[in-house]
Amino acid sequence: MERWWFNSMLFKKEFERRCGLNKSMGSLGPIENTNEDPNRKVKNIHSWRNRDNSSCSNVDYLFGVKDIRNFISDDTFLVSDRNGDSYSIYFDIENHIFEIDNDHSFLSELESSFYSYRNSNYRNNGFRGEDPYYNSYMYDTQYSWNNHINSCIDSYLQSQICIDTSIISGSENYGDSYIYRAVCGGESRNSSENEGSSRRTRTKGSDLTIRESSNDLEVTQKYRHLWVQCENCYGLNYKKFLKSKMNICEQCGYHLKMSSSDRIELLIDPGTWDPMDEDMVSLDPIEFHSEEEPYKDRIDSYQRKTGLTEAVQTGIGQLNGIPVAIGVMDFQFMGGSMGSVVGEKITRLIEYAANQILPLIIVCASGGARMQEGSLSLMQMAKISSALYDYQLNKKLFYVSILTSPTTGGVTASFGMLGDIIIAEPNAYIAFAGKRVIEQTLNKTVPEGSQAAEYLFQKGLFDLIVPRNLLKSVLSELFKLHAFFPLNQKSSKIK
């Protein structure tokens, strides 16, 4: 077995706060834990690039966990084997690179730069002639390589320093990463085998066996609340930055779910929001009780969890100075389901907008009618549609429907599709019956993407697909086109 040692670290730069990590595993083969000491965690590397006679390596590193900030940065390491052959390991967070190369010109410069450092180290530690794996190109370090590089990131999380990171395996699947599983608390989406505390993950051209302690897993579980998982690419987005990015995934640009409060903050000018009917709550009209939890208890639970009284917020505000009536559904409250209170609040909003001659916006995010209220929830479809009929046809006012993911069931079948202008968000899931319901009922497979906004837009179901960063300006232009102007412009026109 050949032993490899990190000779020196070329650069030390201050840690980039927002970083991404891409393990380029193409040059690495299987990684297995074959160390004689079971209490010591090692990383063995097979199949180095362009080396047929290499079997594996036992890698030690130059610093402890406390120096993780220096490790996760733009650093280059010199690696030498027992024969004196040298390799450079380049680790660049900014450009998502982790490479191993044999560049002699670079290595000569590197060895020259650290010649004095090695001499100083030898004087302090003495010559280790008795070690058959020690030569003039190497020096021992006081720390061993504790784990795979993901464990380093794991330790970094334990230091409670906030980072915005993406962890991409060689197969570009976040589920293959140990830190992904630790943060998300779920299993890899690819096939994996778990035996005791050992995990084996299959990546492109490599096998990873990671020995992990239960303490590490328990520690990382504590940080799950710091991250939001993308529904599309399964990447991790740092929650602190996500709101400023309008809940759009940094890795793939997918539009993640937003709370009703965040949407109001996105669309309505600061200081102009005036909510309506905040004290209206459900009273369990049909006394629905399930074996798991009574309906009233579920309502109370969601009220505590979301801080809302119901699955919709309604009110009056200004959008770029234009007075508007707006209702925003919240999927976090019982899946945005439409019960009698939701229907009543939306109906009152429409009637108020009709009386005050205001444009109307309803942002839809719902699983449909609320089954716990039976036929009363179904009647909300007819009630809201009737109010919209008076608003649109009799009052000749302007209603914009915004469909977000997901919009299904009774909401799709009623006011969701009644807008004068219907706008959908990118990648929004929009349907009457969901995919699972259709497949279980008809025993047929629903084609992938057939209920996505882009596919339905091609079929003429919507007028526009508008990203979140453009939505407010698009709505403002639509209102001006329909003779709804900001208050200051309107008053100047009257004068």
UniProtKB/Swiss-Prot annotation:
Overexpression of the accD operon increases the specific activity of acetyl-coenzyme A carboxylase, increases leaf longevity and seed production. The accD operon consists of accD, psaI, ycf4, cemA, and petA in this order. Zn(2+) binds at C230, C233, C249, C252. Binds 1 zinc ion per subunit. Pathway: Lipid metabolism; malonyl-CoA biosynthesis; malonyl-CoA from acetyl-CoA: step 1/1. One of its GO terms (cellular component) is acetyl-CoA carboxylase complex. One of its GO terms (molecular function) is ATP binding. Residues 187-208 are annotated as: Disordered. It catalyses: N(6)-carboxybiotinyl-L-lysyl-[protein] + acetyl-CoA = N(6)-biotinyl-L-lysyl-[protein] + malonyl-CoA. One of its GO terms (biological process) is fatty acid biosynthetic process. Belongs to the AccD/PCCB family. NCBIfam families: accD (TIGR00515). Component of the acetyl coenzyme A carboxylase (ACC) complex. Biotin carboxylase (BC) catalyzes the carboxylation of biotin on its carrier protein (BCCP) and then the CO(2) group is transferred by the transcarboxylase to acetyl-CoA to form malonyl-CoA. This is Acetyl-coenzyme A carboxylase carboxyl transferase subunit beta, chloroplastic. It comes from Nicotiana tabacum (Common tobacco).
